Amino acid sequence: MQKKTGFLLIADISGYTPFIKNHSMRKKPLIGKKIADFWDSHADKLINTLLEEIIENFEPVMKFNKLEGDAALFFLEELNGENQIQGIYDKMLTTREKFNLKVNSLQFVQSCPCDPCQQSKNLKLKMFLHKGFFLQTEIRNNQELSGEALIFIHRMLKNKIKSSEYFLFSEAVLKNLDKHLEFSLITQKVDDFGLSLIHI
């Protein structure tokens, strides 16, 4: 087990839960199993394709840890003397852009009338970034992360921001970002931490 200082990032596809719920067609007996299977396969394919797009874009800068349902968790150990945070922020911008392009291209290329394909345009991307201490443990060849920073970033997901597409940074991250960037400050209690959050 190793204690490290670094960055944790969660890229979360918003609109995923209602998207999946809408396509659980087996709950509607009149639809039939064949149509239900068809719709479910397209819903799964869309989400998997978008998650692959997110991972592919982030991996040059951060290490992919694991999928958490509709979200991907990344980490990066801090290196002294390097401005890693700016590189992460730049990658967040390009990943959001490529995610939206991928959503639009999937909808256009497939030209499919099924509900999952038609509703895919409602899928958006939220990203959360925090800096702190975390533990890294290898269990059966998998790198498992734990610790206070990991708890904190997951608490960041539970906020009152109404938008379905945004970046959310902790104060620890903001200290290292370009001072010329303009952010909106939101003060919100994070359970067991009581820290304010910054979002753009």
Language-model features: locations:
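Conserved small/polar residues in nucleotide/adenosyl-binding loops
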Residues: 198-200
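Catalytic beta-strand-to-alpha-helix segment of the class III nucleotidyl cyclase homology domain
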Residues: 79-189
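Catalytic NTP-binding/metal-coordinating core of nucleotidyl cyclase/transferase enzymes
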Residues: 1-90, 94
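Short acidic-hydrophobic surface loop/beta-edge motif
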Residues: 188-196
